[in-house]
Amino acid sequence: MQFLSQALKIAPVSFLAYGVNVAQAEVLNQESLAKQVLHETFGYQQFRPGQETIIETVLEGRDCLVVMPTGGGKSLCYQVPALVLNGLTVVVSPLISLMKDQVDQLLANGVAAACLNSTQTREQQQEVMAGCRTGQIRLLYIAPERLMLDNFLDHLAHWNPVLLAVDEAHCISQWGHDFRPEYAALGQLRQRFPELPFMALTATADDTTRLDIVRLLGLNDPYIQVSSFDRPNIRYMLMEKFKPLDQLLRYVQEQRGKSGIIYCNSRAKVEDTAARLQNRGFSAAAYHAGLENHIRADVQEKFQRDDLQIVVATVAFGMGINKPNVRFVVHFDIPRNIESYYQETGRAGRDGLPAEAMLFYD
């Protein structure tokens, strides 16, 4: 099992301390163990507002709906319980890039995590499945369409999962800003796993969307946490268009090499804007759904590594982006709705340091 063993070599400490050593979990109550996991595995001294109550509620076996701003610490709300509970936590995620980022971060923190996706070889997928069966893997990231395959659900039933976390849960609702039909089938899981605690997480969901998530996922009397959407470290600004390209170039020049994202509403405008930035000597690249997968993956990887300063993108550059040091987000066009605007500007300043969101308007 070379593929899996390489991952687990990176992650021996927390896996042994919180996955196998059941005696320790019996000595410490779950709340104390959760705080220990937070500190020793993830390196935080204390929970952010709302996190501790959510985690305690999940550990009690109750369903939860978590609406927390981008960069607010949603992932820890299921990652900490996953290491306290004795079993497998399944995380539903819509994007391969998002799964990979999460798994890489967990492995770096010493947590035995893996994902199943279409980019893996059959052998790699079998090794991950074996790791779930033997209890080696604590968190499994998977796309909704793969999770809902009958043969996979049969396997999952034998693995005795302890928690199901549905990330980007607004995708299940037609009232949400990013409806995905494959999410709709997740409601069938409640009948299959009636006792399994469910956690739904999203950064943006109005009252109607929240009700839809609860109904469609079959959440039972869920604890609902809606956190403040204030991002005090982000400075929101408006700029009226006169000579928009010149204004944009001047603004980017003022950023002095800082990392940023520029959103445009069309692929043609993305390509044109990226080319003009490149011609002026900026480290910039285009990103949209019309590009081949390997090109998009290369752009994202370079951006994550700080080998690329600016990504000019359509909304396709979205949920999979988890880069802490984005210092500015520009909307060169008016975004399609306020939810999209909030989520996209929320990619700035995830490290808590000052950042800017600039909106150009006519």
Region locations from a protein language model:
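Cationic, low-complexity basic patches in intrinsically disordered or flexible, solvent-exposed regions
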Residues: 3
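Short, positively charged and aromatic/hydrophobic N-terminal segments
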Residues: 9, 14-24
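Helicase motor core with emphasis on the C-terminal RecA-like subdomain
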Residues: 28, 32, 36-41, 45, ...
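Conserved Rossmann-like nucleotide-cofactor binding loop
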Residues: 97
